[in-house]
Design a protein with these regions (language model features):
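Specific transmembrane helices
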Residues: 1-84, 169-218
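Aromatic-anchored segments of alpha-helical transmembrane domains
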Residues: 44-52, 113-123, 163-171
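Small-polar-interrupted transmembrane alpha-helices in polytopic inner-membrane proteins
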Residues: 48, 80, 84, 105-121, ...
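Hydrophobic residues within alpha-helical transmembrane segments
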Residues: 78, 111-118, 131, 135, ...
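Active-site His/Glu-centered metal-binding helix of metallohydrolases
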Residues: 85-90, 94-95, 99, 118, ...
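Membrane-interface helix/loop boundary segments of multi-pass membrane proteins
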Residues: 86-111, 146-153
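Functionally important transmembrane alpha-helices
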Residues: 131-195
Length: 218
């Protein structure tokens, strides 16, 4: 419903107000190739694998069967597919395409990505935490923008975004200096270094994740 409302709203704006096909905003018919499915899973799995090089322990939380079902469903359907599609529709579809039409592709890739990073700043964050999350958010935004530019559609970046959310922040796996009892599996690091843990924002803004964004962007 969440995705349908957003895509329906975008369709009405494009068709009725702007008189521009959705395809011009890189929002066409969904089409997924095996390569992008592999890439979508490879990025979070690479991050998890690299963390195994650092001292820590795996811990499994004891969750009721119904709680686990709800956790998996929410991770896949909402934080994964829905959030990935909606955020890519807005940032890589509408905003990036509009900026590209107004200026050029380079600005279109960078400007919305920095905005994407800034919007992940949360109340109560320290200054280093803010800097860290803006850098990480901007880089992953640039990665998704490059994927969209290369393929000509938002659907591959939405797939990568969705799988990342599902595995890394959806409640299935948590990596940090302390366990989260609401998450199914925890990898508890022996260090509390903000570079490795991601500081205030978490593993998504860690140097390991940032390195993964850069590797896949190249």
């Amino acid at each position: 419903l969440y995705v349908g409302l957003v895509l329906g709203g975008v369709f009405l704006i494009c068709k009725k107000m702007l008189k521009i096909p959705m395809a011009d905003f890189k929002i066409g018919k969904p089409d997924v190739y095996p390569f992008w499915i592999i890439a979508a899973f490879a990025m979070p799995l690479l991050v998890i694998l690299i963390y195994q090089l650092f001292a820590g322990t795996w811990q499994q939380s004891t969750l009721e069967a119904e709680t686990l079902k709800q956790l998996v469903a929410g991770s896949v359907a909402y934080l994964g597919l829905a959030t990935g599609i909606v955020e890519e529709t807005v940032f890589r579809g509408i905003i990036m395409s509009s900026v590209e039409y107004a200026w050029n592709r380079k600005i279109a890739v960078i400007a919305p990505s920095v905005l994407f990073g800034c919007l992940h700043i949360e109340e109560g964050m320290s200054i280093p935490g803010m800097i860290q999350v803006v850098i990480a958010g901007s880089l992953v935004g640039i990665l998704f923008s490059l994927v969209t530019c290369y393929t000509g559609t938002i659907w591959y970046s939405a797939l990568m975004h969705g799988i990342w959310n599902c595995l890394m922040i959806g409640g299935l796996i948590h990596i940090g200096s302390a366990a989260d009892s609401a998450v199914w599996y925890n990898y508890v690091l022996d260090t509390d270094s903000f570079l490795l843990t991601g500081g205030d924002f978490g593993v998504e803004s860690s140097v390991i994740s940032i390195a993964a964004y850069l590797i896949f962007a190249v």
